[in-house]
């Protein structure tokens, strides 16, 4: 039976972006070195943060619009009395 010589070198790691072809520019090296994280459409927020800070439809309708109209009409009435 044939015997192989013992391995003396450390195991090789896969080549990094620096070891790639020299024709790559900085943006290519950046895209190879940094993995893209999913969820870019969430403006950097987690799903929990987005759910907590979103505008939910109000079953009562345009409440804020009505409150603003009432406040403005009260201000006009007070201004006319003076």
Swiss-Prot record:
GO molecular function: acetyltransferase activator activity; chromatin binding; DNA binding; transcription coactivator activity
Stimuli inducing this protein: Up-regulated by stress agents, such as nutrient deprivation (at protein level). Up-regulation by gamma-irradiation is eventually followed by down-regulation. Expression increases with the tumor aggressiveness. up-regulated by DNA-damaging agent such as doxorubicin.
InterPro entries cross-referenced by the UniProt entry: NUPR1-like (IPR018792)
Motif position, Nuclear localization signal: 65-82
Top-rank taxon, per record: Eukaryota
Bias (Acidic residues) ranges: 17-28
GO cellular component labels: cytoplasm; intercellular bridge; nucleoplasm; nucleus; perinuclear region of cytoplasm; protein-DNA complex
Other known facts: Mediates resistance to anticancer drugs, namely taxol, doxorubicin, gemcitabine.
Pfam families to which the protein is assigned, alphabetical: Phospho_p8
Protein's recorded name: Nuclear protein 1
Localization (cell): Nucleus; Cytoplasm; Cytoplasm, Perinuclear region
The organism of origin for this protein: Homo sapiens
